UniProtKB/Swiss-Prot annotation:
Name of the molecule in the record: UPF0292 protein PF1724
Keyword terms of this UniProt record: Magnesium, Metal-binding
GO MF term set: metal ion binding
Cofactor details (free text): Binds two Mg(2+) per subunit.
TM segment ranges: none
Keyword Disulfide bond annotated: no
Annotated residues for binding of Mg(2+) 2: 69, 71
One Pfam family named in its UniProt record: Toprim
Cofactor: Mg(2+)
CDD domains linked to this entry: TOPRIM_RNase_M5_like (cd01027)
PANTHER family: UPF0292 PROTEIN MJ1624, UPF0292 PROTEIN TK1411
Organism annotation: Pyrococcus furiosus (strain ATCC 43587 / DSM 3638 / JCM 8422 / Vc1)
Residue ranges of domain Toprim in the record: 20-103
Amino acid sequence: MYPENYEKFEKIIERLREFKGVIIVEGKRDEDSLRKLGVQTEILRLSRSSLADVALLASEHEEVMILTDFDETGEKLAKRLYDLLVGLTKVDMETRRELQFIASKDAKGIEDLYDLWESLRLRFWAPKEGD
């Protein structure tokens, strides 16, 4: 990842930390990764309930962010969730698209974001010897 993409990645991570709605992820490792990144908002896991149940719970919030993995299954889940939620609440798919564009070569999904962030932070922003 190039330094300019790292800066974009950092801005997305900051947006995740500041997000006030509910975030939908696929599983526990995805949630754990987001928590390590400092995300404190409510997170719903698809592994805990049916797609329809998660969509129903999410629709009770003013804004929903869909963060499924970047593989084919994640794409299909994101589309199905969007179709269920659009018109019921504000749905953020853009953050997932941005993450996919910037990080998909280095991360297969949401569960990899913390490790990617940590390695990039050390690579691009670690103090140089003598500082």
